[in-house]
Swiss-Prot record:
Tagged with keyword Ribosomal protein: yes
InterPro entries: Ribosomal_bL17, Ribosomal_bL17_sf
Database matches in SUPFAM superfamilies: Prokaryotic ribosomal protein L17
Protein's name in the database: Large ribosomal subunit protein bL17
HAMAP family: Ribosomal_bL17
NCBIfam families recorded: L17
GO cellular component terms, semicolon-separated: cytosolic large ribosomal subunit
Native organism: Borrelia duttonii (strain Ly)
Top-level taxon of the source organism: Bacteria
Amino acid sequence: MKTKVGFNRLDRKSSHRKALLKNMVISLFRHERITSTKAKLSEVRRFAEKLITRAKVDSVHNRREISKFIHDKYILNKLFTKISPIFKERKGGYTRVIKLGQRYGDAAEMAILELVDKTLGEK
C-alpha cells in the first residue's frame, strides 16, 4: 500500500502548489526573508536549499537547470553572483526558520524563513 511519502501537498493541486513554491522561493531570494505559515515555509526551504547548493558551482548547465525553476533573470543573476558566493564554504543549512506563534484569524502556525548570512545589504 502506498503511503504519504516525500512532501506536504499543502491542500492544493500540483500546478497550484508548484506555482506557490516558485513564487515564494523567488520572494525569498529577492527579500532574503519571508513570513508565512510553517507548513509552506518548510516546503519552500527544501527547494531553496537545493537551488543554492546547485548555484554554488557557476556553470551553464546549472544556470539552465535553475532557470527552469526561476524565470526572473534578475533573481537568477542575484542567486549566482551575490547569494551563492556567501555560502561557498557552508555545506548546507543556508536558511533558518523562526517560529512566530499562531495567527489571530485561524490559529495557523506562523514563521519567518530567512537566509542565514544576511550580509548582502541590497535593501
